[in-house]
């Protein structure tokens, strides 16, 4: 759908488009160079969601078409893209 973006520690990328309900958006997160990282996702009126990332993972969420903000709350660079 969109990306990829490289997000340095402490930085974020906002305005990421998401699919409208009933379709879910898959957010892929990869720790550049491997290892462990942390990511925070937030869209619309939803609360922040913090997750650990071990190497690479994906999250499937129904963001309802709201724009997504992704923040790197870890100490390793992240690569993020959506589908």
Swiss-Prot record:
Q: Looking at the record's lineage, which domain of life comes first? A: Eukaryota
Record field: compositional bias (Polar residues):
54-65
Q: In its UniProt entry, what is this protein called?
A: Uncharacterized protein DDB_G0274299
Location of the region described as Disordered in the Swiss-Prot/TrEMBL record: 40-65
What species is given as this protein's source? Dictyostelium discoideum
């Amino acid at each position: 759908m969109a990306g990829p973006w490289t997000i340095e520690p402490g930085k974020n990328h906002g305005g990421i488009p998401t699919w409208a309900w009933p379709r879910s958006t898959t957010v892929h997160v990869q720790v550049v160079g491997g290892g462990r990282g942390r990511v925070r996702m937030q869209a619309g009126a939803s609360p922040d969601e913090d997750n650990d990332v071990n190497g690479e993972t994906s999250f499937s969420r129904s963001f309802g078409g709201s724009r997504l903000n992704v923040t790197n709350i870890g100490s390793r660079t992240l690569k993020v893209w959506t589908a």
